[in-house]
A protein has these predicted regions:
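Short, charged interaction patches at domain edges and termini
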Residues: 1-8, 44-54, 94-126
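Small/polar-rich, solvent-exposed N-terminal microdomains that initiate assembly or binding
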Residues: 1-47, 87-88
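Short amphipathic alpha-helices in soluble, non-transmembrane regions
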Residues: 9, 72-78
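Extracytoplasmic
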Residues: 36, 54-56
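Short hydrophobic/aromatic beta-strand micro-patches
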Residues: 60-62, 120
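Catalytic phosphate/metal-binding cores of nucleic-acid and nucleotide-processing enzymes, i.e., regions
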Residues: 67
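A common structural junction motif
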Residues: 77-86
């Protein structure tokens, strides 16, 4: 499921532009950011009942410019959050924002907007 989420983020031209991404570098990284303006993420499973899995996606929108970090965060929300009965795709049934916050790292002069998304995913136990 993580690959499907990453594909949605990487395929969006508006997010691509905000991140200053290029063909060789999407500026979307696992665990730690590697560019001044980027997204870093962590992914983990929370619960499973054999029918549905809940997973947590932690997203960090990072930029020296707070307004840009906020724009990146808002675009990620637009791309991922499911409204009403809308599913993200056939397997990802629901995506909801479940907390977050912002901080400023003095040493690197970077603003970080952190968001926790909860994904409800169809599970196929065989």
């Amino acid at each position: 499921m993580l690959n499907e989420i990453l594909n949605i983020l990487k395929a969006d031209s508006e997010l691509y532009s905000l991140l200053g991404a290029n063909v060789k570098d999407s500026h979307i990284y696992m665990n730690n950011g590697k560019a001044d303006t980027c997204i870093s993420y962590k992914y983990s499973s929370i619960t499973s009942d054999g029918i549905k899995v809940q997973s947590k996606l932690e997203i960090n929108c990072i930029s020296p410019d707070y307004a840009k970090a906020e724009s990146i965060f808002n675009r990620v929300k637009q791309l991922l959050i499911t409204v009403g009965n809308r599913q993200l795709n056939n397997d990802i049934l629901n995506v909801a924002l479940n907390g977050g916050g912002s901080l400023y790292i003095e040493e690197t002069k970077q603003h970080i907007i952190k968001a926790y998304f909860i994904l409800t995913i169809r599970e196929r136990m065989i």
